Amino acid sequence: MKILHHGAVNGVTGSCHELQLDDKQGILIDCGLFQGAEVSGDKSSANDLEINFPIAHIKALVVTHVHIDHVGRIPYLLAAGFEGPIICSEPSALLLPLVLEDAVKIGFTRNKQLLNQFQSVLNKRIVSVPYGKWHPVFEGLSVKLKPAGHILGSAYVECQVGRARQRKKMIFSGDLGAPYSPLLATPKAPYSCDTLVIESTYGDKNHEGRSSRRKRLQQIIEKAVADKGVVLIPAFSIGRTQELLYELESIIHQSSDKPLDDSLKWGDLEVIIDSPLANDFTKSYRQLKQFWDKEARKVLSQGRHPLSFENLLTIDDHETHLQTVRYLQRTARPTIVIAASGMCAGGRIVNYLKALIEDKRTDILFVGYQAQGTAGHDIQTYGERHGYVELDGKRYSINAGIHTISGYSAHAGQRDLLNFVKRMRHKPREIRVVHGDEEAKREFKLRLEQLLGDSTEVVIP
């Protein structure tokens, strides 16, 4: 039995891990897309989407959550001949077809008949599994999904291999969420395992607390309004967008009658989601209220609607998108715009950036990790020194204000990751650190070794 890594070993994207029982049977945990300059373990890049490892023995795919860097290569996996089930949580079973339809449109075809055929195949493969229940995959292997607190439907995966005294337990963390995130319950540490494969996106840093980051969010908006400008927030269509809406509704609800400036109250500030996919996900989030945390359900019981409030405008069609970009470029009306992609590597956010990034009144707020090689990473890196960024082959000066609030990353910080291990009753004998930049992985490995001593071997694959 061994664990192989086909992604998220040289960065944070392209997650794909294999638990191989022998040369005749194994499973995959995730099958994600590479983004930016990141590559796989065998140096396959974001532009090389082929499945370049043997899959004849792969009996099932287990999905931790539906972000594209964890599921984006599923169409290629199916095209390569994979015929097993796609196992995921109940919320992910609803969300996954939306994500992959969008991925197929971008990477393969927009032909409606072919899209319908793909969705038909996908829906037959998806097996939804309740949280906390053992699910037999084949003889000698069962999996259990536990809430990971990253996005709705996210899970870490417990794999139980063998029988009785020879039984081994492997855990794949997927992406773990930060505690006290909007809408989601804090993930609980597992009881025990033999081997833990754990992410390290923020293995070298901690996030600010929720009340602090909400205060900063409010301050950034107040600054932009004072500057008579637009706040642009590049965000993943799923997860971060809904968390931001929840926080914005809360700020607006508490301050609705308070003036932002001489002519605008909080209650009159427009919030725009310009992303058809984000709008679809937000509708699905509303359908999945039973999976929200206690705080969010309490807000609903008060008659409030944190994902569909009065100030919220949604844009679906492309012409309205272009009209909105031109209008904001012309007027710089104080507005909050949330648009994909989260790393500015395409999507509608790029048009807003081209129109507004050179305007000093604009503020750009990053709320998620920016992978090397993406426009988002360049803006974040060179913005403070008023450098430039290349968008669609043209250079743009970065005159906008650049801000980062890491707590909305939906990822656990270093302290949270350490607590996930620390709170296990029986510690793993081996920990494999993946899904992080080199510095983050090294720092997290060091902290784990300090915590666990010689009883656990900590490796970076």
Q: What are the residue ranges of the model-derived segments?
A:
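His/Asp/Glu-rich metal-coordinating catalytic cores
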Residues: 1-62, 67-71, 76-243, 247-266
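A short helix->loop->beta-strand "cap" motif at the edges of active sites that frequently abuts
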Residues: 25, 81-85, 227-229, 267-269, ...
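Short, compositionally biased "basic patch" segments
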Residues: 40-42, 182-197, 290-297, 370-397
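Short secondary-structure boundary/capping segments
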Residues: 101-106, 212-213, 248-252, 286-295, ...
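Hard-cation-handling environments
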Residues: 220-375, 390, 434
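A short, acidic, amphipathic alpha-helical segment used as a generic capping/interface helix at domain edges
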Residues: 347-356, 409-425
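Generic long, charged, amphipathic alpha-helical segments
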Residues: 389-421
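C-terminal structured "cap/appendage" subdomains that terminate the fold
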Residues: 417-448
